[in-house]
UniProtKB/Swiss-Prot annotation:
Residues 62-168 form the Expansin-like EG45 domain. Residues 1-25 form the signal peptide. The keyword Signal applies. The gene is EXPB3. This is Expansin-B3. InterPro entries: Expan_Lol_pI, Expansin/allergen_DPBB_dom, Expansin_CBD, Expansin_CBD_sf, LolPI, RlpA-like_DPBB, RlpA-like_sf. Disulfide bonds join 65-93, 96-163, 101-107. It comes from Oryza sativa subsp. japonica (Rice). It comes from the Eukaryota. GO terms for cellular component: extracellular region; membrane. Its main location: secreted. GO terms for biological process: plant-type cell wall loosening; sexual reproduction. Residues 181-262 form the Expansin-like CBD domain. It holds the Pfam family Expansin_C.
Length: 268
């Protein structure tokens, strides 16, 4: 996670903010769309980066959305924190954006696609992408990745795009600590919107759906007043209101920390 309440992280955050303030001093903090080439399909933002220069962001290759192994396919380290208008208190997790940098000589101007996997609270701009080092460097001209990363903070343009995870179906990772009266699951790899705004669970031999609640990030939980009876079907709803049902995707012999792949997927 990019934000921590530990003393060490607080000092790092203060240092990062001071650096951002100094770098941003070269141009107004409240810049307008007129600073960029007019393009109605793109919005303006600022970008920073964190973690290793060629890493996926967090040291544990995770983040505030709960995704695992973001250094591997399909994330492939092309990840980003989003501030609240992008992160949306966790409901923006998994959404995909095209980004391209401007106003720096090392910028290629070519769009790159990133996935929201983490959050940030730094007061940089209305829209702020705190990118992995890999994603930040990907916006550079060939051979100028490090030069662009050394800029620290840059102007970018961005737009929301459909997610597309070739060869993958919606996947459910049962979280550690789940038991017969507490069930928590990470939802990932949704094409289209990429995000999830609601998850519902149906027990075996039941005809009704029980709403789960967002635990944090893309992890949803159900605290039950009775022992849950598997197999479970899960129904997910994305930001557009489209629903998918993964029938009996969680088997009767489910286990914490196990991954269960469905046979369903949104159209991208």
């Amino acid at each position: 996670m990019a934000f921590s309440i530990s003393k060490k992280a607080a000092v790092a955050a203060l240092f990062s903010f001071l650096v951002v303030t100094c770098v941003a001093g070269a141009r107004p903090g409240n810049f307008s769309a007129s600073d960029f080439t007019a393009d109605p399909n793109w919005e303006v933002a600022r970008a920073t980066w964190y973690g290793a220069p060629t890493g996926a962001g967090p040291d544990d290759d995770g983040g505030a959305c709960g995704f695992k192994n973001t250094n591997q396919y399909p994330f492939s380290s092309m990840t980003s924190c989003g501030n609240e208008p992008i992160f949306k208190d966790g409901k923006g997790c998994g959404s995909c954006y095209q980004i391209r940098c401007v106003n720096h000589p090392a910028c290629s101007g070519n769009p790159e696609t990133v996935i929201i996997t983490d959050m940030n609270y730094y007061p940089v701009s209305k829209y702020h992408f705190d990118l992995s080092g890999t994603a930040f460097g990907a916006m550079a001209k060939p051979g100028q990745n490090d030069q662009l990363r050394h800029a620290g903070i840059i102007d970018i343009q961005f737009k929301r795009v459909p997610c597309n995870f070739p060869g993958l179906k919606v996947t459910f990772h049962v979280e550690e600590g789940s038991n017969p009266v507490y069930f928590a699951v990470l939802v990932e790899y949704e094409d289209g919107d990429g995000d999830v705004v609601q998850v519902d669970l149906m027990e075996a031999n039941s005809q009704s759906w029980t709403p789960m609640r967002e635990s944090w990030g893309s992890i949803w939980r159900l605290d039950s007043n009775h022992r849950l009876t598997a197999p479970f079907s899960l129904r997910i709803t994305n930001e557009s209101g489209k629903q998918l049902v993964a029938s009996q995707v969680i088997p009767a012999n489910w286990a914490p920390m196990a991954v269960y792949r469905s046979f369903v997927q949104y159209s991208s």
